[in-house]
UniProtKB/Swiss-Prot annotation:
<keyword id="KW-1000">Mitochondrion outer membrane</keyword>
<dbReference type="GO" id="GO:0042803">
    <property type="term" value="F:protein homodimerization activity"/>
</dbReference>
<dbReference type="GO" id="GO:0005737">
    <property type="term" value="C:cytoplasm"/>
</dbReference>
<protein>
    <recommendedName>
        <fullName>Queuine tRNA-ribosyltransferase accessory subunit 2</fullName>
    </recommendedName>
</protein>
<dbReference type="InterPro" id="IPR028592">
    <property type="entry name" value="QTRTD1"/>
</dbReference>
<feature type="binding site">
    <location>
        <position position="382"/>
    </location>
    <ligand>
        <name>Zn(2+)</name>
    </ligand>
</feature>
<feature type="binding site">
    <location>
        <position position="353"/>
    </location>
    <ligand>
        <name>Zn(2+)</name>
    </ligand>
</feature>
<feature type="binding site">
    <location>
        <position position="351"/>
    </location>
    <ligand>
        <name>Zn(2+)</name>
    </ligand>
</feature>
<dbReference type="GO" id="GO:0008270">
    <property type="term" value="F:zinc ion binding"/>
</dbReference>
<dbReference type="GO" id="GO:0032991">
    <property type="term" value="C:protein-containing complex"/>
</dbReference>
<feature type="binding site">
    <location>
        <position position="356"/>
    </location>
    <ligand>
        <name>Zn(2+)</name>
    </ligand>
</feature>
<dbReference type="InterPro" id="IPR002616">
    <property type="entry name" value="tRNA_ribo_trans-like"/>
</dbReference>
<dbReference type="GO" id="GO:0005739">
    <property type="term" value="C:mitochondrion"/>
</dbReference>
<dbReference type="GO" id="GO:0120507">
    <property type="term" value="C:tRNA-guanine transglycosylase complex"/>
</dbReference>
<comment type="similarity">
    <text>Belongs to the queuine tRNA-ribosyltransferase family. QTRT2 subfamily.</text>
</comment>
<keyword id="KW-0862">Zinc</keyword>
<dbReference type="Pfam" id="PF01702">
    <property type="entry name" value="TGT"/>
</dbReference>
């Protein structure tokens, strides 16, 4: 695996990750995102439907929490999770937790980390964790770590230090077992940067992890309360400054467009794409614009036709009918609202996705009101394609030195 930087502007990194995969013949552009999956499948979509989406990321994200209970089957199968789920040509990154449904805290010890599957808690020792990775055979995998000290709340120095010490101990043990494993010789371990909101421990974690032979870095614990955004961003800038430039930086729990841009400005390369799934589960469609070539005022009013109406929404409004506790954002419209009952426009005018070319807001509203499964399929197709297009626009903006304009455009669409 080789990371080639084409351009670095004010901390933003434009480039390619080359020689990926078991054969070393795959390339991924950065900044970019991973394909969010649940038990190895894109939510609501079949493999055939997924192929109809433009710009699908080259790396799919698996979550250990959803697969740990089934690793015996995969171990017996012996061909890895890619072949098992019918995606043998895809690249896979295995993370510990599902960013949409993180488990309860308080189950990390010096010898194990717990993940939460469909049947409850699964305790992971280092040996069990590496045995599961041998069964999955991912291209990349997040190392076992103590991620319970985050920036979302004040962390004591003692707890932050314990988090870093445990994570480094887990990393050394995993690296040793990887050396002894024939199956995992071509897999890459992603080291995890921990330390909560304690600057000293964050920097120690970054420096010590960088000394190990890891293939990249995962910035953990930077998701959380928007009220502490400035603290998180300051920590993030300091941490990325300690990391080598020739290895990719991933971040977990950050997926909203405005937060993505803030992290890119601080040197982050790869993000999770769970935000489109959350939007779909709310019965909503992404409608924010990211085309800097268009007149922003005209784009907001004409392309989507909803900006003036959406300004009046209460940002704290919950969409309880969907069973999703996430708050609605200004980047989406709620198609369950009655006003879309006779709206025969596409979700986004000019969008090239299958849903927008073939269906209307009124039709999606009808599907949602009648609880048709097709609603989730069509919304997921649109939301994924829209989100992947956003990352394409980020790379174009970096090429053309227009990232500041793109950021301004995104910020103008927020409440």
């Amino acid at each position: 695996m080789k990371l080639s930087l084409i351009k670095v502007v004010n901390g933003c990194r434009l480039g390619k990750i080359q020689n990926l995969g078991k054969a070393g013949d795959c390339t991924v552009d950065i900044p970019g995102c991973l394909l969010y999956t649940r038990t190895g499948s894109a939510p609501h979509l079949t493999h055939q439907t997924l192929r109809n989406i433009h710009g699908v990321p080259g790396i799919a994200q698996l979550t250990l929490s959803s697969l740990a209970e089934h690793h015996e089957v995969l171990a017996e199968y012996k061909k890895g999770v890619g072949s098992f789920i019918g995606m043998p040509e895809s690249l896979f990154y295995c993370s510990l937790h599902d960013p949409v449904t993180p488990g309860p805290a308080g189950y990390v010890t010096s010898k194990s980390v717990s993940v939460w599957g469909f049947g409850g808690r699964v305790e992971m020792t280092v040996s069990k964790f590496m045995a599961i990775q041998e069964a999955l055979q991912p291209d990349w995998f997040q190392c076992l770590s103590d991620g319970e000290a985050s920036c979302a709340e004040t962390t004591s120095i003692k707890r932050a230090r314990k988090s870093v010490d445990r994570s480094l101990l887990f990393l050394d043990s995993c690296l040793r077992l990887q050396e002894e494993s024939e199956v995992l010789q071509k897999s890459v371990i992603i080291g995890v940067i921990e330390g909560g909101d304690v600057m000293e421990e964050r920097l120690r974690s970054a420096r010590e992890t960088a000394k190990r032979p890891v293939g990249g870095f995962l910035l953990d614990g930077f998701q959380g309360d928007p009220a502490v955004t400035e603290t998180r961003l300051h920590l993030l800038s300091s941490v990325t400054a300690e990391l080598p430039e020739d290895k990719p930086r991933l971040i977990c729990g950050v997926s909203r467009p405005d937060e993505v841009l803030e992290c890119i400005e601080r040197g982050v390369d790869l993000f999770e794409s769970f935000f489109p799934y959350q939007v779909t589960e709310r019965g909503c469609a992404l409608t924010f614009t990211f085309d800097c070539q268009l007149n922003p005022e005209e784009t907001l009013l004409q392309q989507n036709g909803i900006q003036e109406k959406i300004k009046g929404l209460d940002q704290a409004k919950k969409i309880e009918a969907t069973g999703c506790n996430q708050e609605m954002t200004s980047f989406e419209i709620n198609l369950k609202e009655k006003k879309y009952q006779e709206d025969f426009d596409p979700l986004v005018r000019g969008c090239s996705c299958y849903c927008c070319k073939n269906h209307t807001r009124a039709y999606i509203h009808h599907l949602l009101m009648t609880n048709e499964l097709l609603a989730g399929v069509l919304l997921m197709m649109h939301n994924f394609e829209h989100y992947f297009g956003f990352f394409c626009s980020i790379r174009e903006a970096l090429k053309n030195d227009t990232l500041a304009q793109l950021k301004e455009l995104i910020c103008r669409q927020m409440f």
